[in-house]
């Protein structure tokens, strides 16, 4: 993937850039793997906003991605197309399996149209192949990793994400996560070899607010710019600093939010580095 920069023909174009999509081989998705997707605008079934800054944007269709792949062990597949997916930062690859079934997977870096992909313990260690962590050599870079065996990929699914397999001891495997956190997972959990493609996506300059609105991202308004009825930092005569320590719109103190009593904390060897207060 490359990035194409625009000339400053308008204020919105000045400094903005866009992906060149050279790796994409088809513009329309596989019809059998597409489902309708209704925009929720960040609201729950009661109509209340539960996730701020969401709404609007272009209508999308959901592409069904195979995050498990365990039921295709020993069945080879051919990469038919690399496609754009509006629902994620990564590209997706359409696989044609030898038994006639078609499925989407996340497209790893350097995976190309026509490549052969395999699943299961006998698969080679090459990008796109999916197998259990206990069958992958220590030091290998992987992505789309399960948290629990058979639960489907949960870690390292966005563009450019990768996890390094640091060690394997008994029934557990030690991983270095994209955040820098080092944690252990069950060695039976599956992962896909390689890193997620489209790594340059993070370098795109959106140029104007309107391009983010096309993606369904609404403005982020500061609490001190609101009225007291809308935020604890709101109100005051003239511009004020908020008058208290930073809090959320619901009065929750700013800082770390992970519970120290969370059961899975025992599997975290080293926490990620963060600037947030404890």
Swiss-Prot record:
The keyword Transcription regulation does not apply. It comes from the Bacteria. Disulfide bonds: none annotated. SMART domains: Ribosomal_L2, Ribosomal_L2_C. Pfam families: Ribosomal_L2, Ribosomal_L2_C. Belongs to the universal ribosomal protein uL2 family. This is Large ribosomal subunit protein uL2. The lineage of its organism: Bacteria, Bacillati, Actinomycetota, Actinomycetes, Kitasatosporales.
């Amino acid at each position: 993937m490359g990035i194409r920069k625009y000339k400053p023909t308008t204020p919105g174009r000045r400094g903005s850039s866009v992906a060149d999509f050279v790796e994409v081989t088809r513009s329309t998705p596989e019809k059998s793997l597409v489902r309708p997707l209704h925009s929720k605008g960040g609201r729950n079934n009661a109509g209340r906003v539960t996730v701020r800054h969401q709404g609007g944007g272009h209508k999308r269709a959901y592409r069904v991605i195979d995050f498990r792949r365990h039921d295709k062990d020993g069945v080879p597949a051919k990469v038919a197309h690399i496609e754009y997916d509006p629902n994620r930062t990564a590209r997706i690859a359409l696989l044609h399996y030898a038994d006639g079934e078609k499925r989407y997977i996340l497209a790893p870096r350097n995976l190309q149209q026509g490549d052969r992909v395999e699943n299961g313990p006998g698969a080679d260690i090459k990008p796109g192949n999916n197998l259990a962590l206990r069958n992958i050599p220590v030091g290998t870079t992987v992505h789309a990793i399960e948290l629990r065996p058979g639960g489907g990929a949960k870690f390292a699914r966005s563009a450019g994400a990768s996890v390094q397999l640091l060690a394997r001891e008994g029934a557990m495997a030690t991983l270095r996560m994209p955040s820098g956190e080092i944690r252990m997972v069950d060695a039976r959990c599956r992962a896909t070899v390689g890193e997620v493609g489209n790594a340059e996506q993070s370098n795109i300059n959106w140029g104007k607010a309107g391009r983010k609105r096309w993606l369904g991202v609404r403005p982020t308004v500061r609490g001190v710019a609101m009225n007291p009825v809308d935020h604890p930092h709101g109100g005051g005569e003239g511009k004020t600093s908020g008058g208290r320590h930073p809090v959320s719109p619901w009065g929750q103190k700013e800082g770390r939010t992970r519970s120290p009593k969370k059961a899975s904390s025992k599997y975290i060897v080293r926490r990620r580095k963060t600037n947030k207060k404890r």
